[in-house]
């Protein structure tokens, strides 16, 4: 039987820990191995996602059922807040493990507001390269909001398979 011991920390100290965690998570998400075109190695990405799944199961299952995670997709910011909240509530993990949990959840269970998303959000949720993410944002600036997936397919230079793999993540609200 696993017994989790929690220490009651002052509110300012918990806030400091959560702030540090959010910064560490942000660095962990953006500091991905890339080549000169902003492309990540697909094998490295797959390995990171496998490791993320394992760490997520370990860290999250000590407090709740894993099914609780998958009730609602969340944006990059919402996963930031969720993981920071987990840390302040006593979830046991290193900052690197929290960053990996957040990266995994954002990538596999993220929600992407296509018409307002930043390049960072496109990369985090869909696994796009920096170049692909920038092309989408520039196209959106030049042509206006995307009505649906078909409109997004008009953007040249995208790996359409990456978009199709995460159709449920795409939100086209106006």
Tell what function each PLM region has.
Residues 29-55, 110, 116-118:
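Electrostatic cytochrome c docking/interface patches
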């Amino acid at each position: 039987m696993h017994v989790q011991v929690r220490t009651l920390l002052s509110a300012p100290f918990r806030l400091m820990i959560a702030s540090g965690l959010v910064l560490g998570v942000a660095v962990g998400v953006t500091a991905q191995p890339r080549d000169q075109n902003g492309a990540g190695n697909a094998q490295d990405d797959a390995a990171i996602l496998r490791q993320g799944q394992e760490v997520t199961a370990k860290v999250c299952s000590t407090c709740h059922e894993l099914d609780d995670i998958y009730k609602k997709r969340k944006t990059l910011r919402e996963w930031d807040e969720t993981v920071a909240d987990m840390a302040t509530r006593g979830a046991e993990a290193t900052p690197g493990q929290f960053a990996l949990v957040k990266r995994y959840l954002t990538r596999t269970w993220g929600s992407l507001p296509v018409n307002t998303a930043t390049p960072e959000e496109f990369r985090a949720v869909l696994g796009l390269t920096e170049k692909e993410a920038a092309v989408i944002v520039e196209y959106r600036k030049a042509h206006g909001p995307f009505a649906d997936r078909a409109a997004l397919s008009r953007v040249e230079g995208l790996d359409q398979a990456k978009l199709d793999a995460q159709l449920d993540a795409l939100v086209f609200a106006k």
